[in-house]
Amino acid sequence: MRTAVLLLLALAGAPSLALAQTGYIPYFGKNQIRYDNFQWHTYQTEHFEIYYYPEIEPHLERIAGYAESAYQHVSSELKHDLSMKLPLILFSTASEFWQQNVQPGAAQEGVGAFAEPGRYRIVMPIDEPPDLLYRLIVHELTHQFQFDIIPTGLIRRNMPLWVFEGMSDYMTGYWRPLDIMTVRDAAVSDIVPKMSEMEEYGGFSNPRLIYNLGHAAFEFM
């Protein structure tokens, strides 16, 4: 059912949204400085090819377990399986994550992780509490399912941002208290925009509002 809803939303999508905006807030005017030389290794699971370096090895099986659990959850909810293993690129800390060069400019302060559509890669740090880390994986993994389900080309480009981000937040099954507060505040203040106006971050003083209103819309559906 949710797969059908997603495809219908794609067909009815509002005008253009660049895929480069779906995983993170655009980042301009800064250079990424690399301080570390990471020694990469790979670890295979049923659905992931995990890239890690020695500092991450003590946590590797735990993270792999989170990833596989997240896959089963998203796959079951969307009634869809991916035909390939997903590259999952791990960094030990946020500061090391900011040095990534998978998608130049994608990692910055305030960005917890990102999903890269071209090669279906997920890039993230692991220095979060277990429950938050699991939800982060679910969110980014949902993006990869979206990229796989929604046809490429014109239809995918027309997907509004609230669909991509709202659905990914909805799939985590969790509301942060601050996020639900922003939704209530928008409703009480009568400033909830039309869905056709929730296509990009522009015009919103709080970029999280796009995520939160989209989350609320999927919860309603």
List where the protein language model places each region.
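Short alpha-helical scaffold segments that flank and stabilize functional sites
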Residues: 13, 70-73, 171, 175, ...
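Sec/Tat signal peptide C-region and signal peptidase I cleavage site
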Residues: 14-20
